[in-house]
Amino acid sequence: MAFRLKLVPDKTSVNFFKWGGIPTHATFALALASLIAVMTIGLNYGIDFLGGTTIRAESSENVAVSEYRSALDQIELGDVTITEVFDPGFRADQFVKQVRIQAANETEVSNALIGQVEAALQVVDPQVVFTAVETVGPKVSGELIQTAVLAAVLAVAASLLGIMAYVWLRFEWQFGFGAVVGLFTDAMITVGLFSVFQVRFDLTIVAAVLTIVGFSINDKVVVFDRVREILRRDSTTPLPELMVVALNETLSRTVMTTVTTILALVALYIWGGDVIRGFAFAMLFGSVIAVYSTIFVSAQVVLWLGVKRDWEKKTDTGPSGTQFTTSAE
């Protein structure tokens, strides 16, 4: 006997648009508030943006990262990140860890503080050898922030433009514009969350934002594809009703995908360690806001813009809409 887990019934009839554009306008207001928070409060930049000191530690003993971290907790340090370094060329008894330290108040890490760090690590691992120490001062870190932030903004902007072009070609320009509006609110609100709560913002969070964009567009394309299928077979029903049908038909898939993603992210947040916790936190919030924006932002924008109903209508140059054909060899 087979058992099937159903979080959502096969057939649902939820009217997602009974509140009109209120949820959409509320989302726009929240995105604007997030932008204002980033501009006024700012972000709690991590070592990737502010610079600091990187210490490379090698040992013949495989000491856990948690033991290194416990040893450094006794010292008054700024933001500290400890990661294991793996390389196929390492010997069987060669274990390398990288300790990255951001000094408090954005000042340069002193040699005395570096000495305290090395002494603390030698207590828990007498075999440890420090093979390299690199420091990025506060003057360089200011330039680093500008360059890194600009690169991150350009990366997100390029991904949004590419996604809009794809959806435009795959469907219609209204779908592409609606998708990009939803993706922008996803990214902006997520970044705003980090600004308001001053959670550490580093390159892993930039990666999380781009991952959220990918997760979100996947959900939107599924819904838009169902809308197009329904439009092809129904040319009389009002578009809002067809959109509700499409959202309900894909609701089970959306819920199951989101729930399984959240379960994995919760495990990463709890047991993944400090390095990946920020990524998991951003993804937990982003996976929920992505589904929300599909229904209450992207779909609503498409309704406001309207779409043509004659998907199968022939024109002088061929079928209407963007079509891709292949010929047999």
Swiss-Prot record:
It is a multi-pass membrane protein. The keyword ATP-binding does not apply. GO terms for cellular component: plasma membrane. The keyword Hydrolase does not apply. It is found in: Cell inner membrane. The chain crosses the membrane at residues 27-47, 149-169, 177-197, 204-224, 256-276, 279-299. Pfam families: Sec_GG (PF07549), SecD_SecF_C (PF02355). InterPro entries: SecD/SecF_arch_bac (IPR022813), SecD/SecF_bac (IPR022645), SecD/SecF_CS (IPR022646), SecD_SecF_C (IPR048634), SecD_SecF_C_bact (IPR055344), SecF_bac (IPR005665). Keywords: Cell inner membrane, Cell membrane, Membrane, Protein transport, Translocation, Transmembrane, Transmembrane helix, Transport. GO terms for biological process: intracellular protein transmembrane transport; protein targeting; protein transport by the Sec complex. One of its GO terms (molecular function) is protein-transporting ATPase activity. PANTHER family: PROTEIN TRANSLOCASE SUBUNIT SECF (PTHR30081:SF8), PROTEIN-EXPORT MEMBRANE PROTEIN SEC (PTHR30081). NCBIfam families: 2A0604s01 (TIGR00916), transloc_SecF (TIGR00966). Part of the Sec protein translocase complex. Interacts with the SecYEG preprotein conducting channel. SecDF uses the proton motive force (PMF) to complete protein translocation after the ATP-dependent function of SecA. Belongs to the SecD/SecF family. SecF subfamily. This is Protein translocase subunit SecF. It comes from Ketogulonicigenium vulgare (strain Y25). The lineage of its organism: Bacteria, Pseudomonadati, Pseudomonadota, Alphaproteobacteria, Rhodobacterales.
